[in-house]
Every structure is written in C-alpha cells, then in structure tokens.
Amino acid sequence: METQQIKETIEMISEENLDIRTITMGISLLDCVTGDLQTTADKVYAKIMAKAANLVPVADAISDEYGIPIVNKRISVTPVSLLAGADQNLDFRPIAQAMDRAAKDLGVDLIGGYTALVQNGSTPAETALMKSLPEVLDTTERVCASVNIGSTRSGLNMDAVKLMGTVVKEVAMRKPQNAMKLVVFCNAVEDNPFMAGAFWGISEGDVAINTGVSGPGVVERAIAAKPAASFEEICETIKQTAFKVSRMGQFVGKVAADRLDVPFNIVDLSLAPTPAKGDSVAQILETMGLSHVGTPGTTAALALLNDAVKKGGIMAAERVGGLSGAFIPVSEDANMITAAAKGQISLEKLEAMTAVCSVGLDMVAVPGDTPDATISGMIADEAAIGMINNKTTAVRVIPVPGKQVGDIVEFGGIFGTAPIMAINDGDAQQFINRGGRIPAPIHSFKN
C-alpha cells in the first residue's frame, strides 16, 4: 500500500469509527446429535468449549497488535432444531442453556443458532423450537434465535408466519429486550456473522471464521469531501472506500483463522451502524443531499450505496458472503432515531427501503398492544419482498408493553434508543388465518 493509503486507514480507525464489528466462529453441531437431548446438550457444550477456547484471546491479541478495534467476538452454530435426533421429548431448553453457559464461560458476546428452517414446512421438532422461544430467550442472556419462514425457491410458509406473529409478541411481553434476540427471515443465509440472525448452515464445514466489517463514518466522510460530485463520482468514492474497509476485514479474518488453526470463510461487507455520532448509515444518505432520511429519494440513495459497497468490497476479499450491504436498524442508527422521533420516516418507507438494502425491518419498536396478526402481516410483507426479489429480508420488531406512538424506549449500549413508530391499524386477521403456503414465484424455477 502507498504511504497515503496507510495514513488514510489509520485516520479511519482513529477518527471515523472504522472497526471490525464481529469475528464470528461457525461451529457444526451435527456430530453432537444423540438419542437424548440432555446428552446432546452436554456434547454441544463440550464441542463449543473445545473449538472456541482461544477465540476471545486471539481476537484481543490481534486488536492490540494491529491497533484495529474488534468490537464483538461471537459464535454461530448448526440450527438447533436439527439436533433432536431420536428423542421424542423435543425439549430444546437444555441445549439453549448449554449454549448460553458456553458463551459466558468463553467470554463471547452472543451465540446464534437457536434456529428453525421452516420455509417448506415444519417438523414436530421445529414447531417445538418455535414455541419454546419466549421461555428460552427470557431465561438465557446470550443466545440469539432465528426462524426462516420462506425462500424464493419454496414460497412462504404462512402457518409459520402466523405462529411467529404470536411468538414475537409473547417474547416481547416478558421483556422487550428479548425480542432484540429474535429475527424472522426469508432467504436466510448460512454464513451470516451478524446477530441476531447468525446460524451455521448444514452445508458449511466443521468450523470456520467469518468476519463482519463496519465503516459508515468512513463512507460518510469520503462523500462529504465531494459536495459537488456527480452520481458516478459518488459511486466510485464509495467503491474505493469499501475496498479499504473490506480489505481490513479480510486481513483480520485470515490472521485470526491462521492463529486458531481453522479455515477462513467469508467477509460480510455490510455497513453496520451504531448509535454513536458519526457511525450512521442514514447520515450517509443525508450527506448525498437529502434533508433527512425518509425524504423522497431515500430509497434511490440507499440502492446506490448498497450496490457500490458490494462492488468495492468484493474486490478486497477472497470470498464474500453473509448479508453484505447496508443495515438500517432504527434504534441502532443515530440519524434514523432522530428521523423516527420526528415522524420523518414511516414503517411504510422503511419497508420500501428494505427492497434495496441488506436485510429488512430491523430494531423497529411498535406499540405493545399491536395485534399478533399485524405482526404476522409485517413478517409476510417483508418476506414477500425477499421472495420475489431473490434477496434476504427479515423482521426484528419489538412490541413494547405499555408504550404508544411517540414514546421513547431506551435499550442502551449498541441497541440505542427506539421511538415507538405508528403502525397501520387495519386488520389482517382473516388473511393470516387462511393458513397454508404462498407458492414460490414463477421466476424461481431455474432448472
């Protein structure tokens, strides 16, 4: 690298909030399956402890050695619903407790993979896991959960959509923060390093390292330096910046994998914001020339950003994967929080933005009395966007008991502040109750 590029990278870290958002170790648990879920749980704990024993020390050492902040150390595991084996009891709580205990003992921030993949239908084990979510997320601290209810090739499992509307509500009624650990997906990916939706897919290897980078502040400052630039110049600026950001993720991931003696898998190119000043994806869109996020033109600006990040980042990494784009979590983005609190952005506009961004309706707080069917409708709408457009979409919605539109909820830390957003008061009950499946779109048939 040229001296100027090295200086720019140092400035990105020291002044513009550039960091490695996560190093996530994926671990297969398929070899832990026995005929008894308690025995399986014991094997799960033992394998996680063995494979990830040095994850945190190695990540901390790399951070100290190279001066690169590594914010989170995480683990993703095989979808737990696949671990039932021959046990007819279908009580997955021991496995959840084993995962939580391992995460605490290892010092990792979160562990994902309490997951069911039900896009084609639900087995008894998967139904049991979904119904266990309210209790499991309330009795564990670091376990994250996800459910994939649809895909472009399979269509949408509307029975699961209905169930998850009820489950999300029950999860949040115990404690709103519990809902932050649950994501409902369409087209979920197997190598996502970001929580709460990470799980280690069954086509992945035994163990590997994935990294997720973050640099909204870096991109924003680069664009701000060119106030009169054309769209082509803006795209080129974002691509060059994304290359540097992603190169750092590739470097750190390779070093970590070498030291842990495991394969390096992918870099997730996503721009992940935090509530910190200058670490906002929404601010990037505003710097492009929008008075505030939510203004007409917001979706186009986000599409430009998302595509340019991918084009720049893909040249910097051996393999890219995960979600790779720009996250728009309402409560975790300072400028998004401001726009939502002022009523400058609506759920409907957020939904439109999800058609071109990395994932979906993320960290959205709604009134606690929102009906189950309405939440199911939100999930179905978001999943339909993913199904038709062949992209990953998701819903991480938080019904907050006792709160109404205009109230503010403090989640704290990286989870930020959530203004309670207005939600359409129409009734989706009859639609959701129809049951069955919405078939896959015609363009899904590729063979």
UniProtKB/Swiss-Prot annotation:
> Pfam families annotated for this entry?
DUF711 (PF05167)
Looking up CDD domains in the UniProt record yields: RNR_PFL_like_DUF711
PANTHER family hit by this protein: UPF0210 PROTEIN MJ1665, UPF0210 PROTEIN SPR0218
Family under the similarity heading: Belongs to the UPF0210 family.
The record's subunit annotation is: Homodimer.
What is the protein name for this chain?
Answer: UPF0210 protein LSEI_0897
